[in-house]
Swiss-Prot record:
Subcellular location, record wording: Secreted
Native organism: Cyriopagopus hainanus (Chinese bird spider)
Signal peptide: 1-20
Tissue expression remark: Expressed by the venom gland.
Pfam family, one: Toxin_20
Example GO molecular function: toxin activity
Full protein name: U4-theraphotoxin-Hhn1x
Family classification: Belongs to the neurotoxin 12 (Hwtx-2) family. 02 (Hwtx-2) subfamily.
InterPro entries, per the entry: Hwtx-2-like (IPR012625)
Cellular compartments per GO CC: extracellular region; host cell postsynaptic membrane
Residues making up the propeptide: 21-46
Record bears the keyword Signal: yes
Job description of the protein: Postsynaptic neurotoxin.
């Protein structure tokens, strides 16, 4: 019973941390001061850059090297976030 409680607590903590990181990433994107339409385009572009590029390279039987986010951004939870 104790093990189940510990595992449940750990899972809740991981989910909470992930949600908090995503909220932080969104708030950092909003601080840039771009209009919403431009912000959505940048967000989609950066999300693709982090998460899909590695999968495309793997399909070609090559070593997977994730693309790095550029211009003061870093990849975190498959999203580029402002440093």
């Amino acid at each position: 019973m104790t093990l189940i409680a510990i595992l449940t607590c750990a899972a809740a903590l991981v989910l909470h941390t992930t949600a908090a990181e995503e909220l932080e990433a969104e708030s950092q994107l909003m601080e840039v001061g771009m209009p919403d339409t431009e912000l959505e385009a940048v967000d989609e572009e950066r999300l693709f850059e982090c998460s899909v590029s590695c999968e495309i390279e793997k399909e070609g039987n090559k070593d997977c090297k994730k693309k790095k986010c550029k211009g003061g951004w870093k990849c975190k939870f498959n999203m580029c976030v402002k440093i």
